[in-house]
Amino acid sequence: MDTTFFRRYSGVLVMMDSKTDKVVSYHFVRMEKDIYYKLALNRLREKGYIIQSITCDGRRGLMKELFNTPVQMCQFHMVAIVMRKLRKKHQSQAGKELKIIAKSLVKSSKNDFYRRLYAWFIKHEDFLKERSDKGNEKGYFPYKHRNVRGAYASLKYYMNYLFTFEKHTEMNIEHTTNRLEGLFKYLKRQLNNHNGLTKKRKVMFIKDFLNKKSC
């Protein structure tokens, strides 16, 4: 499941069955919120759907509440989170090495990935603990390398969700939301071929497109 936006405050939340590639639910939204995903999931359950697993882009509040449903964090979104925290021109050696480890995620097993991540942490532990020499107005000495710490903290936070597909091999859980991303790109290309549509007709076009994908 994922949400895409066509302009500010104009998006659509879509849920797809990975086994059939069919859209099973979609809802127009103004912004991306956990509550919208919860409502969409509840509507599916009310219709009799059995939700065996969920692959999403890391909705923290939502993940905590889905106790009985295996949740897979999209690995490409995880890599993107790390890359945003460690910009393209990031200079520290620790940050550069962490970017390399993050990029290896989609081709790694859980054991291999976290063995490399733990080795990285041991190597750079002192670096991560470095604090500024100047205290702030509260007398607190902040950490120097907050971007690197933040990237590492994100990888640790999602640790239990990055390799759910390995734990439940019988379910064939998707480890990325690539199918939906591909659907969104195709939808937007089709919309671009119909420039000049009014807002109402654009909504009708999107509905027709997604309805055909649910057949």
Feature map (PLM): residue ranges:
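RNase H-like nuclease fold core
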Residues: 1-60, 64-67, 158, 179
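Short, charged/polar low-complexity linear motifs in solvent-exposed/disordered segments
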Residues: 18, 41-44, 81, 89, ...
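Alpha-helix capping at helix-to-loop junctions
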Residues: 21, 84, 88-92, 103, ...
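Acidic/histidine-rich catalytic cores and adjacent linkers
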Residues: 49-60, 66, 96-215
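Conserved beta-strand -> loop -> alpha-helix junction used to position metal-binding or nucleic-acid-contacting
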Residues: 53-99
